[in-house]
Structure formats: structure tokens, C-alpha cells
Amino acid sequence: MSSDWDEIKRLAADFQKAQLTSTLQKLSERNCIEIVTLLLEKQLLDVVFTNDGKEYITPEHLEREIQDELYANGGRANLVEVSKTLNVDLSRIEKLAERIAADDPQIHLMLGQLIDEEYITHIAQEINEKLSQRGEISISDLTSQFDLPSDFLQHQVVEKHLGKLIKGRQDASNPRVFFTQAYIQRCKAKIRGALAAITKPTNVSVILQQISVQEKIFHSLLDEINPAGHVTSKQANAQYVPHIYAKTQADWVNSFYKQNSFLEYDAINKLGISDAKSYIRKQFPNEEFLFLKRVALGARLIELTVVASLNECSATKQYLDLSTILPSNLSEEDIEEAFNAVMAQKHCNPSQFVYLESIVFSQAYLTQLVQPCQEMAQSLAKTAIDNGVYQQYIVEKTLAQKAGNTLGTTHDADEDSKLDKRDERRKKATSGKAGGGSQGRETKTKSTKKHQRGRAAHNHDSDDEEDAVQQSANSSRKSVKSLELVKISDITNLIKGTLEEEGLEHLAKPVASLYLNQLNQMALAKAQELYEAAPQTNRRQTHAAIQERVNTLLVDIRLYEKGLKLFNGDTQTQLVKYLLKSLGNDICNELTLYVAAECSLMVKSTNLNVDQRVKLVQECDAQYRNALLEQNKALNKSIEEFEVATEAVLKACSMIIKKVDKKKDRQLIVGHKEKLLQQLLECQEPALLLHLAALILFTTITGCILHASGKFVSSILQHIRSTLNEPQNALLLRYHDLVLQVLQQTSPDSAESKSVNEQLQALQGEVMDLAQNYSRASVSKAD
């Protein structure tokens, strides 16, 4: 019975449970997804999916989650971190964060971060603690510490809580700096104590380094402190100058000026004053100064000492040593600058004085000093007339002036160019500058100086037409250099004695330089006067000089002719041509130029070729023309025909030929040999040394002199070969071959070239010894 009752109770409970329980229909995951998708398509539902797409959440719930994260992070949440934590796309987080910041004024969105007021209050408390510890803080420091924008920190944090949570004040000159009043008082105390201890100018940077105060605070508090001194500027190199030091400076400057009447800039600069001139003007506003490069001279020193002494010097016609009346520590440059400044201010007449190395000469003193030099200038002018120097200067000057007026026409220039080119081709075919020797060898050497005197001493071996044309062109473009009859040494020697008595001998040359041009012009004027007074005398002297030079050249040709006649055949012919093209050409030039001067013709150049002489001769008077033309033609003939033609020209010029003097001939030969020996001793070039040695041996062996260029060396050696012994011939031949090798070398620095030069150097002494010491019994007896 009891069991039945229990069964009834159980069934009743089950029935009641069935009545109370609602019917639920479970859906599968796929069905749920389809239902949500359908709701989203119909925009009946707004959800946010997670990054993995497995979960979704409503925006309202996501917003609550973001605020929870902000609270959990202490009031400052990075949206990137929130996105990672909630597993939601960052863009959805940023949109909701913007909405949160817009709806709630207590929350700020800043650089991808949400910040609430509680966090800002916390920051303000930290800033206040830091400001209390340091006394001064800047927004830039806070920016780096809290990683927040400077404007946000300044306006939303510091300025908002300044005077409340943050106990301090803002710098008026720099609103981004904040400090406490206690800090300002400490800085004032440091600055006041440091400046009170300074007794000399000190850099502000050094002061700030010692007291650990910032420069901007130093300058802002300086006026409030009112120190016993001043700061020169607010720049980096500013200095603090205490008043006691400035007073010491002023006392020293006043004392020095009172005692010396001048001030040195260097001395003032050493006192720590950078602009000395401005300081002097400020310190002495009522004084007048003469400001020089290194010193400033007071008006009292200028007026009472310098100007007064200069006036006395001018009145007594003496000289004045400025170094004795000016301060001793002034340099010579300072003294000269002071003198020029005094002259510029017209305290004295500048034309009455001459300044030389701190000595001021009155013009009257110098005039008296150089008075004897005027007599010397007249004497030198007479000497220049007597020896023909001035006459030659007048001729060259006249020719240059005429050439400058007439040279330059195109027709004449073309004609001269054609003549020069034809003559150059003719010279290349016949002169000793090119061609081969008797053995097919060519020795390119410099021409030996020949025995001649006067104007014939030109370099005949290089009768180059380009030089002649260039010389002519230069003479037409440039005026003749002014003749200097009086030299500076002449004046110096004459006035040195007088100056030496005064201890001023070191100024003799500078004084001479002042009067050199004046005395030279005086001498030239006197020479012109004498020249105009005796023209006939000058003409006779020129006539005699030309006659002497031509006779000397004719004697040389006759002596050289004896030597070249010892050669046979083609060698003799070439030597004759070379002799006439050199010495013969000089004779033609001498006589042609003389005749041109007699006929008052303009000559472009004194070194003429055949065509130029022919052109010039055509303009000469008839009495000279034929003789000069025949003489020019004879240059291409024999020596005898040239001498006959020259005699005809001399006769037309009223000149005579001197008789042959065999005793004098012997002296000329000996003198010629001595000159060759002297050149040999001075010679270092192998080719020229061989050339000289050959000519000396030829003269020693034959007793005759020879006029030959380097191309004839092999012929000369062949001619004297029979007279020399075998070792001597071998020595000369070996040296000759080595010279040819040197001349044919294309690379002077090669090993072969160096070897040849070493061999030549080794044989040089033997060749010179042979040329100097060789003798024959017959020759020695004749000498």
C-alpha cells in the first residue's frame, strides 16, 4: 500500500514538472549562422566580428569593453593594445574611441591613445613632485618623459593645474618653462654671491658654469639683482665687468694719457677693452685725437711738439728726427703715419718737407745737399757727347719714331715677309747651320766666338730672319729706352760724405733716388745742347768709328782666308761662303747703315739681310747705290771680289783701307788663340768643347786662324790628322763619335745616353789637355 502511494507521488511530481517546463527547440550551429546572416542582410542586427571571425559582439558591448580596458590600464589605453586584447579590428576600435571621446568630455583621444581625467590628475601630481625636487622644469623635458604632445601637456595638464595641483609659476619670457619661487630665490642668491666676488672681467659662461644657473635665467634676474657691474652683451662671448675694474681701467688710461699725451690700442686692449677707439672717444669727449693704426695722439702732442718742430725745421733749412720728439715706443710705421696725417691736416706746407725713415728733411736742405750733383750732371753730359753715347741714343730714338709712324702698312709687311722667306730658304741651302761634313757626319754645335771688335760682335752663325723681323717689329712698337746719363751710385757717392757727418749715411741712396730723374733730365738737356752745338764734330766721329770697324773686319777676313785656303775642294768653297755670310754680311750692314744715315733714311733693323739691304740701297743717293749693290752681289762670289767691291764702297764713303801690318797680324793670331783657350776652359758642353779643341789644334799646327761652324769639325780633324800621332787621333775620333751619339739621342734619360755622357766626361780632360799643351817644333819656334 505504501509503495503504491509512493508511485502516485512520483507521478504527480513528474506531471507538475511537465506543466511548469516550457518547450524548447534546440538549433544547430549552421542554423544559428544562417539566422544571424539573414538578420544582418536585412539590417535588423548590428554586430562586430572578431579578427578570426568566430565570434561577434554588438557595438554597445564593445564600447563597454573599451571603457573597461581604459579603466584597467589606469586611465591611459593604447588603441593598438586594446585591439589586440579584444581581438577586434583596429579601425572599429578607433571609431568607437572617437565616439567615446566625443560623448565624454572627461576622456581625451590623443595620438592613438585614450586618456581620462584621472590619469591627467596623476600626471599633474608627478609633475608637481618633479618641480619641487628640481625647482625648474620645461615642457620639452615632460614631453620626453610622458610621451605626450607638448601642447597637450602645456595646456591640458600644466597650465590647467598650475596653482592647484602644481605649485609653481610660469616664466614670462618663456611660457614653456615653469619654476618654483624657491628656485628663483636660490638662483638670485647664487648670482648675487658670484658677481660680488668677481674683481676682473669674466666670461658669463664661466660664471654660469660655476654656479650652475641657466643663461636665460641669469639675464632675466640680472636687472632685479642690480649688481655692481655690467654685462657687455647677451651673446655667447659676453663678459661681466665689475664697476671697480672699470674704474681701475679709467684711472690707468687717464694717468697714461696725462703723462704721455698718446694712447696705444694694444695697451687698452690688454685691459679687456675690445674697441679702443670708441673707448678713447667716450673717456675723453672734450679732447681731440689723431687716430692712427696703432696709437692715438693727443692734440697737445701734435700742436706743441710735432707742428712746432716742423716749422722750426723749415725756418732753419735743416732736418728733423721725429723719433727724438715723439714717444720712444712708437715704431717707424707709426711715425710715418703721424707725419702723413699732420701733412694731410695742413698744419704745415707738405711741399716744404721730405720724409725718409723717420727723418724729415726741409726742401731747402736737400736742395743745398744735391747742389754739387748738378755740376756732375753737366760733366756726364759732356762725356756722353765725347764718346758718342748720346749720338747713338738720338739715332736709335729717331729711327724708332720713324718706324712707328711708317711701319705697319700691309703692303710693306707682305713684301718683307716674302723677302725674309726667300732669304731663309737660301740660307738653309748655303749656310753652315745645315748640311753634312766631308765624312757625311753633322756636328750640331754652337758657333765659336770669332776675333772681332765693335758692332761686328754679333752671333753670325744664327743669322735668323725671324729675329730680324721680330726686332724690327718690336722697334716700331716700343720707344727707345730713355738714356740714363746719371746713375744713382754717382749721386750717392757725392752726397754720402755730407750725410755721414750727420750720421745719416744710410739715407744717401733714398735721397739719391729722389733726385735721380731730375738730375738725369738735366744731363740729357745739357747733352742735347752740346749735340746741337757741334753736329759736324759728331759726324766726323761716326765716320771714323765706322771706318775703324770696317778695317778691323777686313783684317779678320784676310786672316781667316789664309786658314781656309789650306783646305781643298768643296770644303774650302763652303768655308768661303760661311765667312762671307757672316763677317762679309757685317761689313755690308755697317756700310749700308752708315750710308742710310747719311741719306736720312729710316731703317727698321740694324741686322739686315741681302734683300733688305737691296731695298734700302735703292733709296740711297746715286753716288752710293751702284757700289753698295755690287758689294751685296759679291757676297755670293769669291773673297777677292768681295774685297774689291768693299774698297769701292769705302771710296764712295770717303774712307780709306789701312795697309797690311804682318807684325800686328801675328799678334791678332796669338790673341785669337788665347780667346779660344779661355773659352775652352769655361766650356762644359761636349760638342762645343770638341769644336774649340779642333780650332785650337788647327791654329797651333798651321799658324793660321779659321772661321768655321760646328759642321766643319770633322773636316778640321781630317786635315790635322797627319800631324797628330795615333793615340791623339784615336782620342779625337772617339770623342767625336761620342758627341755624334749624344746629338742623335732621342731620350736623354736612357741608360745608353747616360753611359755615353759618362764616357765623354772621362775623355773631356784628355781632350782639353791635348788642345792646351800640343805643340810642334816649327810652330813653337815661329811663335
From Swiss-Prot:
One of its GO terms (molecular function) is UFM1 ligase activity. GO terms for cellular component: endoplasmic reticulum membrane. The keyword Ion transport does not apply. Residues 446-457 have a biased composition (Basic residues). Pfam families: E3_UFM1_ligase (PF09743), UFL1 (PF23659), UFL1_C (PF25041). The lineage of its organism: Eukaryota, Metazoa, Ecdysozoa, Arthropoda, Hexapoda. This is E3 UFM1-protein ligase 1 homolog. It comes from the Eukaryota. Its EC number is 2.3.2.-. Keywords: Transferase, Ubl conjugation pathway. One of its GO terms (biological process) is regulation of proteasomal ubiquitin-dependent protein catabolic process. Belongs to the UFL1 family. InterPro entries: Ufl1, Ufl1-like_C, Ufl1_dom, Ufl1_N. It comes from Drosophila grimshawi (Hawaiian fruit fly). PANTHER family: E3 UFM1-PROTEIN LIGASE 1 (PTHR31057:SF0). Residues 406-476 are annotated as: Disordered. E3 UFM1-protein ligase that mediates ufmylation of target proteins.
